[in-house]
Amino acid sequence: MVASDIHANWLTLPAFARYSDHRPVFLVGDFALQGTPIEASIAQRAATLGHPTVAVSGNHDSPVVMQSLAGAGAIVLTHAGRLAADGTVHGSAVVSVDGLLVAGYEDPLASQAGSLGHRLDLTPAELADETTTVEAWFDALFPRPDIVLVHDFRVAEALRLHVAAEDGARLIILTGHDHRQHVDRTGDIVEVDGGTLGAGGVFAVGHASAGFAEVHLMPDGWPAAVDLISADPISGDASARRIALDETP
């Protein structure tokens, strides 16, 4: 299960939990709005959504939010390894999750968050630098992961095109940020964006749907299909659109 952009809307989590129970859950950033300590309480709820829950930060998050998530039991990934509740990073950048190799890159703006008025977007020059940095980071990873989490869909798209230029490369990239459900494929590189689990914020509950995705993997780890799911946060009623990926591109 893949979700992102909760934006402190804890009211949507019970509906998502009906689908995620006893499955690995990948949460691709933006647990908060401002990254404040008060919002960090959402992290404790999110950490128990999956078995396990794997997470990276988004541009609305902060160190205190991500450390709270780690302290509640989630696998919080950074470019250098796994984040601990005390803020230290340890271990390999590539971890094993349910038989799959997974890596994640934190959002650069998360380090500046935690107070009102922090920046929420990169300049064009910063975005170009970030895509170059993430591409170089991926190229240096060993072993090569099956799945990469990166919050900003623009960075994810650049990484998809970069990796697809390699002969025989296969990778699933999980992303978010744009609040739009989509699946994009270049060769054997698949990018999945589940939309926004936050459903437009607390005040839109009952009017906006929670979006997330279910990735159906074949025994060799390749995604056979992706279900893009839209659920009512109150009733749990849902609809899904299936994207088949088991054909040769």
Across the structure, where does each feature detected by a protein language model lie?
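Core catalytic region of metal-dependent phosphoesterases/phosphodiesterases
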Residues: 3, 8-94
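Acidic/histidine-rich helix-loop elements
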Residues: 4-8, 32-33, 111-125, 201-207
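Solvent-exposed loop/turn segments at secondary-structure junctions
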Residues: 6-8, 31-34, 59-63, 82-85, ...
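Short hydrophobic/aromatic beta-strand or adjacent loop that forms the aromatic wall/cage
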Residues: 90-92, 100, 208-212
